[in-house]
Protein backbone atom coordinates (compact mmCIF):
# COMPACT_ATOMS: atom_id res chain seq x y z
CA UNK A 1 0.00 0.00 0.00
CA UNK A 2 1.20 3.43 -0.81
CA UNK A 3 0.74 6.02 1.81
CA UNK A 4 -1.01 9.12 0.62
CA UNK A 5 0.16 12.31 2.22
CA UNK A 6 -2.35 15.11 2.41
CA UNK A 7 -0.88 18.54 1.98
CA UNK A 8 -2.08 21.03 4.56
CA UNK A 9 -2.67 24.62 3.47
CA UNK A 10 -0.69 27.33 5.24
CA UNK A 11 -3.81 28.87 6.75
CA UNK A 12 -4.78 25.51 8.29
CA UNK A 13 -1.53 25.15 10.22
CA UNK A 14 -2.00 24.77 13.99
CA UNK A 15 0.78 27.28 14.72
CA UNK A 16 -1.17 29.99 12.90
CA UNK A 17 -4.29 29.12 14.90
CA UNK A 18 -2.48 29.43 18.20
CA UNK A 19 -0.86 32.67 17.05
CA UNK A 20 -4.30 34.14 16.30
CA UNK A 21 -5.61 32.93 19.67
CA UNK A 22 -2.61 34.46 21.45
CA UNK A 23 -3.09 37.83 19.75
CA UNK A 24 -6.79 37.77 20.61
CA UNK A 25 -6.01 36.96 24.24
CA UNK A 26 -3.42 39.74 24.48
CA UNK A 27 -5.69 42.36 22.92
CA UNK A 28 -8.75 41.40 24.94
CA UNK A 29 -6.67 41.09 28.09
CA UNK A 30 -5.45 44.63 27.55
CA UNK A 31 -9.06 45.80 27.20
CA UNK A 32 -10.01 43.98 30.41
CA UNK A 33 -7.15 45.57 32.35
CA UNK A 34 -8.04 48.98 30.91
CA UNK A 35 -11.71 48.64 31.92
CA UNK A 36 -10.75 47.41 35.38
CA UNK A 37 -8.37 50.34 35.91
CA UNK A 38 -11.19 52.74 34.95
CA UNK A 39 -13.46 51.22 37.58
CA UNK A 40 -15.73 49.40 35.09
CA UNK A 41 -15.60 46.12 36.96
CA UNK A 42 -18.81 44.67 35.54
CA UNK A 43 -17.79 45.25 31.91
CA UNK A 44 -14.34 43.83 32.64
CA UNK A 45 -15.86 40.70 34.18
CA UNK A 46 -18.31 40.14 31.30
CA UNK A 47 -15.54 40.59 28.72
CA UNK A 48 -13.29 38.19 30.60
CA UNK A 49 -16.02 35.53 30.85
CA UNK A 50 -16.87 35.78 27.14
CA UNK A 51 -13.19 35.62 26.24
CA UNK A 52 -12.56 32.57 28.41
CA UNK A 53 -15.59 30.72 27.07
CA UNK A 54 -14.66 31.61 23.49
CA UNK A 55 -11.10 30.35 23.86
CA UNK A 56 -12.33 27.13 25.44
CA UNK A 57 -14.93 26.50 22.73
CA UNK A 58 -12.69 27.27 19.75
CA UNK A 59 -9.56 25.56 21.04
CA UNK A 60 -11.06 22.33 22.40
CA UNK A 61 -11.89 19.58 19.91
CA UNK A 62 -14.55 18.13 22.21
CA UNK A 63 -16.62 21.32 21.88
CA UNK A 64 -16.52 21.43 18.09
CA UNK A 65 -20.32 21.53 17.75
CA UNK A 66 -20.52 24.56 20.05
CA UNK A 67 -18.44 26.61 17.63
CA UNK A 68 -21.53 27.12 15.50
CA UNK A 69 -23.81 28.21 18.34
CA UNK A 70 -21.39 30.12 20.57
CA UNK A 71 -21.36 33.37 18.50
CA UNK A 72 -25.15 33.54 18.64
CA UNK A 73 -25.30 32.67 22.34
CA UNK A 74 -22.54 35.17 23.15
CA UNK A 75 -24.26 37.87 21.10
CA UNK A 76 -27.56 37.24 22.86
CA UNK A 77 -25.87 37.37 26.23
CA UNK A 78 -23.95 40.54 25.42
CA UNK A 79 -26.66 42.53 23.65
CA UNK A 80 -29.84 41.15 25.28
CA UNK A 81 -29.24 39.61 28.69
CA UNK A 82 -26.49 41.96 29.85
CA UNK A 83 -28.45 45.21 29.13
CA UNK A 84 -31.55 43.61 30.65
CA UNK A 85 -29.73 42.72 33.87
CA UNK A 86 -28.17 46.21 34.04
CA UNK A 87 -31.57 47.85 33.54
CA UNK A 88 -33.19 45.77 36.28
CA UNK A 89 -30.25 46.50 38.61
CA UNK A 90 -30.52 50.26 37.98
CA UNK A 91 -34.25 50.10 38.79
CA UNK A 92 -33.36 49.34 42.42
CA UNK A 93 -31.06 52.38 42.78
CA UNK A 94 -31.46 56.16 42.85
CA UNK A 95 -29.23 56.54 39.78
CA UNK A 96 -29.98 59.90 38.15
CA UNK A 97 -28.29 62.99 36.74
CA UNK A 98 -27.56 64.24 40.27
CA UNK A 99 -26.91 60.80 41.81
CA UNK A 100 -24.56 59.15 39.34
CA UNK A 101 -21.27 59.36 41.26
CA UNK A 102 -19.85 56.99 43.82
CA UNK A 103 -19.73 58.18 47.42
CA UNK A 104 -15.97 58.74 47.27
CA UNK A 105 -16.22 60.73 44.04
CA UNK A 106 -19.12 62.87 45.32
CA UNK A 107 -17.19 63.62 48.50
CA UNK A 108 -14.14 64.58 46.44
CA UNK A 109 -16.20 66.99 44.31
CA UNK A 110 -17.63 68.68 47.40
CA UNK A 111 -14.20 68.92 49.04
CA UNK A 112 -12.81 70.66 45.95
CA UNK A 113 -15.31 73.52 46.20
CA UNK A 114 -14.05 76.88 47.38
CA UNK A 115 -15.48 80.22 48.38
CA UNK A 116 -14.11 83.73 48.10
CA UNK A 117 -13.41 85.90 51.12
CA UNK A 118 -11.52 89.08 51.74
CA UNK A 119 -10.76 91.89 49.34
CA UNK A 120 -10.43 91.30 45.62
CA UNK A 121 -7.41 92.87 43.91
CA UNK A 122 -7.32 93.86 40.25
CA UNK A 123 -4.33 92.46 38.37
CA UNK A 124 -2.43 93.11 35.17
CA UNK A 125 0.16 91.08 33.31
CA UNK A 126 3.27 92.69 31.89
CA UNK A 127 5.68 90.94 29.52
CA UNK A 128 9.31 90.77 30.52
CA UNK A 129 11.52 89.03 27.96
CA UNK A 130 10.03 85.53 27.64
CA UNK A 131 8.43 85.73 31.08
CA UNK A 132 5.59 87.63 32.71
CA UNK A 133 5.21 89.89 35.73
CA UNK A 134 1.99 89.99 37.78
CA UNK A 135 1.00 93.37 39.21
CA UNK A 136 -1.82 93.67 41.77
CA UNK A 137 -3.39 97.09 42.35
CA UNK A 138 -4.11 98.12 45.96
CA UNK A 139 -7.30 100.22 46.17
CA UNK A 140 -6.87 103.90 47.18
CA UNK A 141 -3.07 103.53 47.05
CA UNK A 142 -0.47 104.28 44.45
CA UNK A 143 1.54 101.23 45.38
CA UNK A 144 1.47 97.93 43.58
CA UNK A 145 2.16 94.36 44.59
CA UNK A 146 4.54 92.99 41.99
CA UNK A 147 5.84 89.46 41.52
CA UNK A 148 9.10 88.13 40.24
CA UNK A 149 9.12 87.16 36.54
CA UNK A 150 7.46 83.78 35.98
CA UNK A 151 6.47 81.50 33.12
CA UNK A 152 2.91 80.70 32.08
CA UNK A 153 3.90 77.35 30.61
CA UNK A 154 3.76 75.55 33.97
CA UNK A 155 0.59 73.46 34.26
CA UNK A 156 0.99 72.56 37.95
CA UNK A 157 0.02 74.68 40.95
CA UNK A 158 2.69 77.35 41.47
CA UNK A 159 3.24 79.59 44.51
CA UNK A 160 4.04 83.19 43.57
CA UNK A 161 5.18 85.78 46.15
CA UNK A 162 4.44 89.47 45.55
CA UNK A 163 6.11 92.51 47.08
CA UNK A 164 5.19 96.16 47.44
CA UNK A 165 6.61 98.49 44.83
CA UNK A 166 6.24 102.26 44.68
CA UNK A 167 6.90 102.66 41.00
CA UNK A 168 4.14 101.38 38.76
CA UNK A 169 5.07 98.87 36.10
CA UNK A 170 5.70 100.45 32.77
CA UNK A 171 4.94 98.99 29.41
CA UNK A 172 1.86 97.68 27.70
CA UNK A 173 -0.21 95.27 29.80
CA UNK A 174 -1.44 92.00 28.36
CA UNK A 175 -4.76 92.19 26.59
CA UNK A 176 -7.87 90.32 27.68
CA UNK A 177 -7.33 87.93 24.79
CA UNK A 178 -3.90 86.92 26.09
CA UNK A 179 -5.26 86.49 29.62
CA UNK A 180 -8.06 84.30 28.30
CA UNK A 181 -5.62 82.16 26.33
CA UNK A 182 -3.51 81.61 29.46
CA UNK A 183 -6.41 81.29 31.88
CA UNK A 184 -5.65 77.68 32.72
CA UNK A 185 -2.08 78.55 33.74
CA UNK A 186 -3.23 81.60 35.71
CA UNK A 187 -5.72 79.45 37.61
CA UNK A 188 -2.76 77.39 38.87
CA UNK A 189 -1.14 80.43 40.49
CA UNK A 190 -1.34 80.85 44.27
CA UNK A 191 -0.34 84.43 45.06
CA UNK A 192 1.14 84.97 48.54
CA UNK A 193 0.76 88.53 49.91
CA UNK A 194 3.34 90.14 52.23
CA UNK A 195 0.99 89.49 55.19
CA UNK A 196 0.83 85.78 54.33
CA UNK A 197 -2.69 85.70 52.88
CA UNK A 198 -3.16 83.65 49.75
CA UNK A 199 -5.07 84.70 46.65
CA UNK A 200 -6.24 82.85 43.58
CA UNK A 201 -7.64 84.03 40.29
CA UNK A 202 -11.38 84.61 40.68
CA UNK A 203 -12.11 86.33 37.35
CA UNK A 204 -10.34 87.53 34.24
CA UNK A 205 -9.41 90.77 36.03
CA UNK A 206 -9.15 89.91 39.74
CA UNK A 207 -7.37 87.78 42.32
CA UNK A 208 -9.13 87.21 45.63
CA UNK A 209 -8.87 85.17 48.78
CA UNK A 210 -10.10 81.61 48.26
CA UNK A 211 -10.76 79.07 51.01
CA UNK A 212 -12.12 75.50 51.03
CA UNK A 213 -15.91 75.44 51.27
CA UNK A 214 -16.00 72.25 53.35
CA UNK A 215 -13.69 70.52 55.79
CA UNK A 216 -13.70 66.77 56.39
CA UNK A 217 -14.58 65.47 59.85
CA UNK A 218 -12.53 63.05 61.89
CA UNK A 219 -14.85 60.19 60.94
CA UNK A 220 -13.82 60.61 57.29
CA UNK A 221 -17.43 61.11 56.14
CA UNK A 222 -19.04 64.20 57.70
CA UNK A 223 -18.48 67.65 56.18
CA UNK A 224 -18.57 71.05 57.87
CA UNK A 225 -19.37 74.22 55.93
CA UNK A 226 -16.53 76.63 56.73
CA UNK A 227 -18.76 79.64 56.00
CA UNK A 228 -21.88 78.76 57.98
CA UNK A 229 -20.65 76.03 60.30
CA UNK A 230 -23.41 73.67 59.14
CA UNK A 231 -22.68 69.98 59.64
CA UNK A 232 -23.52 67.56 56.83
CA UNK A 233 -23.55 63.79 56.96
CA UNK A 234 -24.13 61.26 54.16
CA UNK A 235 -27.71 59.96 54.11
CA UNK A 236 -27.50 56.46 52.65
CA UNK A 237 -31.29 56.33 52.25
CA UNK A 238 -31.46 59.27 49.84
CA UNK A 239 -27.93 59.37 48.43
CA UNK A 240 -27.15 62.96 49.47
CA UNK A 241 -25.07 64.81 52.00
CA UNK A 242 -27.79 66.18 54.29
CA UNK A 243 -27.64 68.79 57.03
CA UNK A 244 -27.88 67.66 60.66
CA UNK A 245 -29.77 69.66 63.31
CA UNK A 246 -28.54 70.33 66.81
CA UNK A 247 -30.77 67.49 68.01
CA UNK A 248 -28.99 65.10 65.65
CA UNK A 249 -31.92 64.73 63.27
CA UNK A 250 -31.86 65.27 59.52
CA UNK A 251 -32.41 68.81 58.25
CA UNK A 252 -33.94 69.95 54.97
CA UNK A 253 -30.75 71.08 53.23
CA UNK A 254 -28.91 68.71 50.90
CA UNK A 255 -25.72 69.05 48.89
CA UNK A 256 -25.32 68.17 45.23
CA UNK A 257 -24.00 66.16 43.57
CA UNK A 258 -25.32 63.13 45.39
CA UNK A 259 -24.12 59.56 45.20
CA UNK A 260 -25.66 56.29 44.04
CA UNK A 261 -27.25 54.03 46.66
CA UNK A 262 -29.57 51.03 46.59
CA UNK A 263 -33.14 52.06 47.48
CA UNK A 264 -34.97 48.77 47.01
CA UNK A 265 -38.50 48.90 45.61
CA UNK A 266 -38.95 52.67 46.01
CA UNK A 267 -38.93 53.38 42.26
CA UNK A 268 -41.63 50.77 41.69
CA UNK A 269 -43.64 52.11 44.64
CA UNK A 270 -43.40 55.63 43.19
CA UNK A 271 -45.20 54.42 40.09
CA UNK A 272 -48.03 53.14 42.31
CA UNK A 273 -48.17 55.72 45.11
CA UNK A 274 -47.09 59.06 43.58
CA UNK A 275 -50.21 60.56 41.98
CA UNK A 276 -48.05 62.74 39.73
CA UNK A 277 -46.62 59.53 38.24
CA UNK A 278 -49.50 57.11 38.82
CA UNK A 279 -52.14 59.04 36.88
CA UNK A 280 -50.09 59.62 33.72
CA UNK A 281 -48.66 56.10 33.91
CA UNK A 282 -52.11 54.47 34.01
CA UNK A 283 -53.43 56.80 31.30
CA UNK A 284 -50.40 56.16 29.09
CA UNK A 285 -50.68 52.41 29.67
CA UNK A 286 -54.33 52.42 28.57
CA UNK A 287 -53.48 54.57 25.53
CA UNK A 288 -50.59 52.24 24.63
CA UNK A 289 -52.92 49.24 24.62
CA UNK A 290 -55.59 51.13 22.64
CA UNK A 291 -53.03 52.41 20.14
CA UNK A 292 -51.54 48.96 19.58
CA UNK A 293 -54.97 47.32 19.31
CA UNK A 294 -56.40 49.90 16.88
CA UNK A 295 -53.24 49.75 14.77
CA UNK A 296 -53.36 45.96 14.48
CA UNK A 297 -57.09 45.89 13.67
CA UNK A 298 -56.80 48.69 11.11
CA UNK A 299 -53.71 47.33 9.37
CA UNK A 300 -55.16 43.81 9.19
CA UNK A 301 -58.50 45.08 7.88
CA UNK A 302 -56.97 47.33 5.23
CA UNK A 303 -54.31 44.80 4.26
CA UNK A 304 -56.80 41.93 3.99
CA UNK A 305 -59.27 43.91 1.86
CA UNK A 306 -56.56 45.22 -0.47
CA UNK A 307 -55.07 41.72 -0.79
CA UNK A 308 -58.45 40.36 -1.86
CA UNK A 309 -58.83 43.18 -4.39
CA UNK A 310 -55.40 42.80 -6.02
CA UNK A 311 -55.88 39.00 -6.16
CA UNK A 312 -59.19 39.38 -7.99
CA UNK A 313 -58.63 37.83 -11.39
CA UNK A 314 -61.16 40.08 -13.13
CA UNK A 315 -59.18 43.20 -12.13
CA UNK A 316 -57.04 44.54 -14.96
CA UNK A 317 -53.57 45.84 -14.14
CA UNK A 318 -53.35 43.87 -10.91
CA UNK A 319 -49.56 43.85 -11.00
CA UNK A 320 -49.40 47.65 -11.19
CA UNK A 321 -51.80 48.08 -8.26
CA UNK A 322 -49.88 45.50 -6.27
CA UNK A 323 -46.59 47.36 -6.75
CA UNK A 324 -48.13 50.74 -5.92
CA UNK A 325 -49.74 49.43 -2.74
CA UNK A 326 -46.50 47.84 -1.54
CA UNK A 327 -44.45 51.03 -2.09
CA UNK A 328 -45.09 52.44 1.44
CA UNK A 329 -43.37 49.32 2.78
CA UNK A 330 -40.31 49.98 0.59
CA UNK A 331 -39.81 53.55 1.85
CA UNK A 332 -37.92 53.76 5.19
CA UNK A 333 -40.39 54.47 7.96
CA UNK A 334 -38.55 57.47 9.38
CA UNK A 335 -38.74 59.20 5.98
CA UNK A 336 -42.47 58.53 5.69
CA UNK A 337 -43.07 59.77 9.25
CA UNK A 338 -41.26 63.06 8.60
CA UNK A 339 -43.19 63.53 5.34
CA UNK A 340 -46.48 63.01 7.20
CA UNK A 341 -45.33 65.48 9.85
CA UNK A 342 -45.11 68.11 7.13
CA UNK A 343 -48.42 67.08 5.56
CA UNK A 344 -50.22 67.40 8.92
CA UNK A 345 -48.70 70.81 9.70
CA UNK A 346 -51.49 72.89 11.22
CA UNK A 347 -50.63 76.10 9.37
CA UNK A 348 -49.03 75.10 6.07
CA UNK A 349 -49.69 71.36 5.71
CA UNK A 350 -51.40 70.12 2.55
CA UNK A 351 -53.96 68.11 4.52
CA UNK A 352 -55.24 71.16 6.41
CA UNK A 353 -55.18 73.26 3.23
CA UNK A 354 -57.36 70.64 1.52
CA UNK A 355 -59.77 70.28 4.46
CA UNK A 356 -60.03 74.05 4.82
CA UNK A 357 -60.77 74.50 1.12
CA UNK A 358 -63.42 71.76 1.00
CA UNK A 359 -65.08 71.91 4.42
CA UNK A 360 -63.65 74.96 6.17
CA UNK A 361 -61.88 72.78 8.75
CA UNK A 362 -58.37 73.20 10.15
CA UNK A 363 -57.86 70.42 12.74
CA UNK A 364 -55.26 71.04 15.46
CA UNK A 365 -53.32 67.85 14.79
CA UNK A 366 -50.48 68.59 17.22
CA UNK A 367 -52.23 70.53 20.01
CA UNK A 368 -55.52 68.67 20.44
CA UNK A 369 -55.07 65.28 22.20
CA UNK A 370 -57.83 63.51 20.26
CA UNK A 371 -56.65 64.75 16.86
CA UNK A 372 -53.02 63.96 17.70
CA UNK A 373 -53.94 60.38 18.60
CA UNK A 374 -56.05 60.03 15.46
CA UNK A 375 -53.13 61.25 13.37
CA UNK A 376 -50.82 58.67 14.99
CA UNK A 377 -53.16 55.78 14.25
CA UNK A 378 -53.66 56.92 10.63
CA UNK A 379 -49.92 57.29 9.99
CA UNK A 380 -49.13 53.97 11.67
CA UNK A 381 -51.83 52.23 9.63
CA UNK A 382 -50.24 53.63 6.46
CA UNK A 383 -46.87 52.26 7.53
CA UNK A 384 -48.20 48.83 8.55
CA UNK A 385 -50.87 47.83 6.05
CA UNK A 386 -48.41 46.71 3.27
CA UNK A 387 -46.95 44.07 5.60
CA UNK A 388 -50.38 42.62 6.36
CA UNK A 389 -51.34 42.83 2.69
CA UNK A 390 -48.30 40.79 1.66
CA UNK A 391 -49.10 38.16 4.29
CA UNK A 392 -52.73 37.94 3.19
CA UNK A 393 -51.73 37.68 -0.48
CA UNK A 394 -49.64 34.64 0.35
CA UNK A 395 -52.33 33.07 2.52
CA UNK A 396 -55.00 33.61 -0.15
CA UNK A 397 -53.03 31.34 -2.48
CA UNK A 398 -53.51 28.50 0.00
CA UNK A 399 -57.33 28.70 -0.07
CA UNK A 400 -58.72 26.10 -2.53
CA UNK A 401 -60.74 27.50 -5.43
CA UNK A 402 -63.24 24.68 -4.93
CA UNK A 403 -64.68 26.51 -1.93
CA UNK A 404 -65.52 29.58 -3.97
CA UNK A 405 -66.92 27.47 -6.80
CA UNK A 406 -69.19 25.64 -4.37
CA UNK A 407 -70.37 28.90 -2.80
CA UNK A 408 -71.08 30.33 -6.27
CA UNK A 409 -73.28 27.35 -7.03
CA UNK A 410 -75.22 28.10 -3.83
CA UNK A 411 -75.70 31.70 -4.99
CA UNK A 412 -73.29 33.37 -2.56
CA UNK A 413 -71.97 36.84 -3.41
CA UNK A 414 -68.56 38.53 -2.83
CA UNK A 415 -69.41 39.71 0.69
CA UNK A 416 -70.67 36.30 1.74
CA UNK A 417 -67.53 34.69 0.32
CA UNK A 418 -65.36 37.12 2.24
CA UNK A 419 -67.04 36.74 5.63
CA UNK A 420 -67.87 33.03 5.38
CA UNK A 421 -64.76 31.66 3.63
CA UNK A 422 -61.89 34.13 3.24
CA UNK A 423 -61.93 35.82 6.65
CA UNK A 424 -62.19 32.63 8.78
CA UNK A 425 -59.41 30.92 6.81
CA UNK A 426 -57.10 33.95 7.00
CA UNK A 427 -57.60 35.07 10.58
CA UNK A 428 -56.38 31.83 12.16
CA UNK A 429 -52.85 31.79 10.65
CA UNK A 430 -52.70 35.59 11.08
CA UNK A 431 -53.31 35.44 14.83
CA UNK A 432 -49.67 34.86 15.92
CA UNK A 433 -48.51 37.57 13.53
CA UNK A 434 -51.15 39.94 14.88
CA UNK A 435 -49.90 39.30 18.41
CA UNK A 436 -46.33 39.99 17.26
CA UNK A 437 -47.51 43.19 15.57
CA UNK A 438 -49.29 44.20 18.78
CA UNK A 439 -46.07 43.69 20.76
CA UNK A 440 -44.08 45.69 18.19
CA UNK A 441 -46.48 48.65 18.28
CA UNK A 442 -46.51 48.46 22.07
CA UNK A 443 -42.91 49.74 21.87
CA UNK A 444 -43.17 51.87 18.71
CA UNK A 445 -40.78 54.57 19.91
CA UNK A 446 -39.69 55.86 16.48
CA UNK A 447 -43.19 56.92 15.43
CA UNK A 448 -43.83 58.91 18.62
CA UNK A 449 -40.39 60.51 18.72
CA UNK A 450 -40.41 61.66 15.10
CA UNK A 451 -44.07 62.68 14.76
CA UNK A 452 -45.33 64.19 18.03
CA UNK A 453 -42.52 63.91 20.62
CA UNK A 454 -45.25 62.66 22.95
CA UNK A 455 -47.18 65.94 22.85
CA UNK A 456 -49.37 67.66 23.64
CA UNK A 457 -48.05 67.58 27.20
CA UNK A 458 -50.16 66.72 30.21
CA UNK A 459 -50.63 69.31 32.95
CA UNK A 460 -50.04 68.62 36.65
CA UNK A 461 -47.61 65.72 36.40
CA UNK A 462 -44.34 65.36 38.28
CA UNK A 463 -42.70 63.67 35.31
CA UNK A 464 -42.73 64.72 31.63
CA UNK A 465 -45.73 63.02 30.03
CA UNK A 466 -47.84 63.68 26.94
CA UNK A 467 -51.19 62.56 25.57
CA UNK A 468 -49.57 60.63 22.70
CA UNK A 469 -46.77 59.10 24.75
CA UNK A 470 -46.46 55.35 24.75
CA UNK A 471 -44.87 53.64 27.73
CA UNK A 472 -41.55 53.40 25.91
CA UNK A 473 -41.46 57.10 24.96
CA UNK A 474 -42.64 58.03 28.47
CA UNK A 475 -39.71 56.06 29.86
CA UNK A 476 -37.32 57.80 27.47
CA UNK A 477 -38.57 61.24 28.52
CA UNK A 478 -38.13 60.42 32.20
CA UNK A 479 -34.60 59.18 31.56
CA UNK A 480 -33.37 61.96 29.27
CA UNK A 481 -35.84 64.88 29.04
CA UNK A 482 -36.84 65.54 32.65
CA UNK A 483 -36.80 69.24 33.54
CA UNK A 484 -35.91 68.43 37.17
CA UNK A 485 -33.13 66.03 36.20
CA UNK A 486 -32.70 62.75 34.42
CA UNK A 487 -34.13 60.00 36.61
CA UNK A 488 -32.55 56.83 35.26
CA UNK A 489 -33.66 54.70 38.21
CA UNK A 490 -37.36 55.46 37.73
CA UNK A 491 -37.04 55.03 33.97
CA UNK A 492 -35.37 51.65 34.50
CA UNK A 493 -38.22 50.59 36.82
CA UNK A 494 -40.82 51.48 34.18
CA UNK A 495 -38.69 49.73 31.53
CA UNK A 496 -38.71 46.62 33.72
CA UNK A 497 -42.51 46.77 33.89
CA UNK A 498 -42.64 47.11 30.10
CA UNK A 499 -40.36 44.08 29.79
CA UNK A 500 -42.74 42.03 31.93
CA UNK A 501 -45.72 43.15 29.84
CA UNK A 502 -44.00 42.34 26.55
CA UNK A 503 -42.85 39.04 28.04
CA UNK A 504 -46.46 38.21 28.85
CA UNK A 505 -47.37 38.98 25.23
CA UNK A 506 -44.60 36.63 24.09
CA UNK A 507 -46.04 33.85 26.25
CA UNK A 508 -49.47 34.44 24.75
CA UNK A 509 -47.90 34.33 21.30
CA UNK A 510 -46.22 31.01 22.05
CA UNK A 511 -49.46 29.55 23.34
CA UNK A 512 -51.31 30.84 20.30
CA UNK A 513 -48.88 29.04 18.02
CA UNK A 514 -49.16 25.90 20.19
CA UNK A 515 -45.49 25.69 21.09
CA UNK A 516 -45.08 23.66 24.25
CA UNK A 517 -42.10 23.63 26.54
CA UNK A 518 -40.83 20.46 28.12
UniProtKB/Swiss-Prot annotation:
Give the CC-aspect GO terms.
maltose transport complex
Can you tell which superkingdom this protein's organism belongs to? Bacteria
In the record, biological process GO terms are: maltodextrin transmembrane transport
Presence of keyword Protein transport: no
One Pfam family for this entry, by name? BPD_transp_1
According to the record, the segments passing through the membrane are 15-35, 39-59, 72-92, 281-301, 324-344, 376-396, 488-508
Q: Where is it localised?
A: Cell inner membrane
Q: Which NCBIfam families match?
A: PRK10999.1
Self-association and partners:
The complex is composed of two ATP-binding proteins (MalK), two transmembrane proteins (MalG and MalF) and a solute-binding protein (MalE).
PANTHER family from the xrefs? MALTOSE/MALTODEXTRIN TRANSPORT SYSTEM PERMEASE PROTEIN MALF, MALTOSE_MALTODEXTRIN TRANSPORT SYSTEM PERMEASE PROTEIN MALF
What is the protein name for this chain? Answer: Maltose/maltodextrin transport system permease protein MalF
Q: Which organism is it from?
A: Photorhabdus laumondii subsp. laumondii (strain DSM 15139 / CIP 105565 / TT01)
